[in-house]
């Protein structure tokens, strides 16, 4: 009888220990997930642009450039999900969109940062908008999946698994999308903002190239134009600046 009690006491002690360990593991996991969500939300909010339509009537002729001209790195294959684009020309109103805190990148020296965020925009041209149905189809074609924070993400695996390589948010604050079967046909936006964190999983240059290709493909499909973080036309010179930033950050992280 006493032996049976001892067994029950041992079982009880083991049960308590297991429950305590389970609680500690759950608490650690919850804190980790919460930290990741907060960090991602901070980055997203910092680099989502705010639309402020201007009365400025001056138009700028925008000439798109071939992919190979924008990003020269022939040893990296293009994403098979994306088709090649042809050169095209659009007219967009100048200064028709403004963004928060993004212009700081141009004037603040890098000073060996350990992390930066690269931003591209796809904006509708000539005072028009991007329409929900064509935008939705284009996002899926480029491998972007609707997910965390109610925005789109390009994962390592285009089916939606693996680490996030870059993300896409609505250009209108607060940045999320409200897509559903009822409103997708009527949904419109002046543009979308794409961003990626450097360092990133895998090859940062390749991941940036994927983001650039996705931006160009969305612009082609939806009738838009690819802009830099300051809402200026994306040029080969600006692409060189982006690539230099990537090299600088990767070098800074290697040196530590």
From Swiss-Prot:
Does the keyword Repeat belong to this entry?
no
Q: Which UniProt keywords apply?
A: Cell cycle, Cell division, Cell inner membrane, Cell membrane, Membrane, Transmembrane, Transmembrane helix
Q: Does the keyword Transmembrane helix apply?
A: yes
Question: How does the entry describe its membrane topology?
Answer: Single-pass type I membrane protein
> What cellular component terms from Gene Ontology apply here?
cell division site; plasma membrane
- InterPro entries associated with the record: Cell_div_ZipA (IPR011919), ZipA_FtsZ-bd_C (IPR007449), ZipA_FtsZ-bd_C_sf (IPR036765)
Q: Kindly report every residue range on the membrane side named Cytoplasmic.
A: 28-256
Which regions of this chain are Periplasmic-facing, per the record's topological domains? Answer: 1-6
Quote the Pfam families the UniProt record gives: ZipA_C
Q: Where in the cell is it found?
A: Cell inner membrane
GO biological process terms on file: division septum assembly; FtsZ-dependent cytokinesis
- Please give the subunit comment from the record: Interacts with FtsZ via their C-terminal domains.
Chain's role = Essential cell division protein that stabilizes the FtsZ protofilaments by cross-linking them and that serves as a cytoplasmic membrane anchor for the Z ring. Also required for the recruitment to the septal ring of downstream cell division proteins.
Protein family according to the UniProt entry: Belongs to the ZipA family.
This protein is called what?
Answer: Cell division protein ZipA
Species annotation: Baumannia cicadellinicola subsp. Homalodisca coagulata
């Amino acid at each position: 009888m006493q032996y049976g009690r001892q067994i029950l006491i041992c079982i009880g002690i083991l049960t308590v220990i297991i429950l305590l360990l389970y609680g500690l593991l759950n608490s650690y996991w919850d804190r980790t997930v919460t930290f990741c969500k907060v960090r991602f939300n901070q980055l997203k909010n910092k680099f989502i642009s705010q639309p402020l339509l201007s009365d400025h009537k001056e138009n700028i002729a925008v000439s798109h450039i071939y992919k190979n001209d924008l990003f020269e790195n022939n040893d990296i294959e293009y994403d098979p999900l994306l088709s090649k684009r042809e050169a095209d020309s659009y007219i967009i109103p100048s200064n028709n969109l403004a963004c928060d805190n993004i212009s700081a990148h141009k004037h603040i020296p890098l000073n060996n940062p350990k992390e930066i965020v690269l931003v591209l925009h796809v904006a509708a041209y000539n005072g028009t908008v991007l329409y929900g149905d064509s935008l939705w189809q284009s996002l899926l074609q480029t491998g972007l999946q609707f997910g965390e924070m109610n925005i789109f993400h390009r994962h390592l695996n285009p089916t939606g698994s693996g680490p996030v390589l870059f993300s896409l948010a609505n250009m209108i604050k607060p940045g999320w999308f409200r897509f559903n079967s009822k409103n997708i046909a009527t949904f419109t936006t002046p543009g979308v903002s794409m961003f990626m964190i450097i360092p990133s999983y895998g090859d940062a240059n390749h991941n940036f190239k994927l983001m650039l290709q996705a931006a160009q493909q969305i612009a082609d499909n939806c009738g838009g134009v690819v802009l830099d973080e300051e809402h200026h036309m994306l040029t080969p010179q600006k692409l060189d600046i982006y690539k230099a930033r990537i090299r600088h950050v990767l070098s800074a992280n290697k040196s530590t």
